[in-house]
Amino acid sequence: MKNQQKVIDGISVPVMVLDNDLHISLANKAAFKSFPELETGAGLEKLGDIDRDIDQLFRDTLANRGSASVTIVTDETFQREFLISVKTVVDLKDFPEPTLVVTFEDQTPLRVAKSMRSDFVANVSHEIRSPLTAISGFVETLQGDASDDPDASKLFLGLMEKEVARMTNLVSDLLSLSKVEAKERRAPKNPLDVNQTIHQSIESVSALADKRGKTLEIDVTPNLPSIRGKRDDLARALINLLENAINYSRDGGTVRLSAHSAPADNPLGGAAVCIAVNDEGEGIPAAEIPRLTERFYRVDKSRSRNIGGTGLGLAIVKHILVRHRGLLTIESTVGKGSTFTAYLPVAALQKT
């Protein structure tokens, strides 16, 4: 029995051996991890709400000396999906009667990925369809009653230009997100001057701040430690954070960027640089914060579209920071504003 236990403990998916009465004779470590209430000698009730679906299947398989498989979804709040495979084994050592060997493959991550992909396609379709519908309506109007009206033509052409710009921004952000995700597993290796990257990002948004009547305040420690990073990617992340702060701050408000060495108790747990962008906007309800980095998620959908937002900016920021082995934290107070802080690990010194 000990040798059999060692063998199944080396299998990464949950494995159980059931006797004729469908009691658990043997289970591996992965099974105990997936089903915390599992006990050797207990029945299927220790599998929680799974047992109602598979009890009869197991009995039929044992009676027929055959094999079977079934996919089930649990009734838990956070549903899990399992592919359960069962096979009758005869003359197994230490088991004089026919037994069932059962494996559980957790399909939940694949199920979630499929759902996210479907949602993503639906969102992209909606985001593109809306401006196309608007442009189609403007063209129809220009071809009809407004064709001889210069003022109306100017108005509708301006609106069409705005919708085209919106689609252009959407396609640009989709391409950026796709590129970042494709490179996410490969952490940058080259040292990067954080101060220069911050300076580049500030220069890129200065004109927008002036146009919107916002003040930029900068507090950056000179000669910050180097990180391992890609300048264009990190600059894109900082520009996205700064543009959001500029767009959502109140009229005449101030956007503050600060960058310092992170304290020892920072979320990364090691030497790091933290770059914080603070705005004086309306703030974000606490319940909305966990979803801010989801694709196409907007707290105020109408306002986001009015300022040309695609709903992808913070998703891009998150994936860029993940590639740099960093992370983003968000703090906000309704009525006062928000602070977005990027933490980036400091590059380890090369031994000589």
Locate the predicted segments by residue.
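PAS-family sensory domains
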Residues: 2-73
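Short alpha-helical segment of the dimerization/phosphotransfer core of two-component systems
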Residues: 162-167
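PAS-family sensory/regulatory modules and their coupling/dimerization elements
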Residues: 43-109
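Conserved catalytic submotifs in the C-terminal HATPase_c
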Residues: 188-191, 210, 215-225, 262
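Conserved micro-motifs of the catalytic ATP-binding
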Residues: 182-187, 226-229
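Short helix N-cap motif at coil->helix boundaries in the Bergerat
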Residues: 194, 283-291
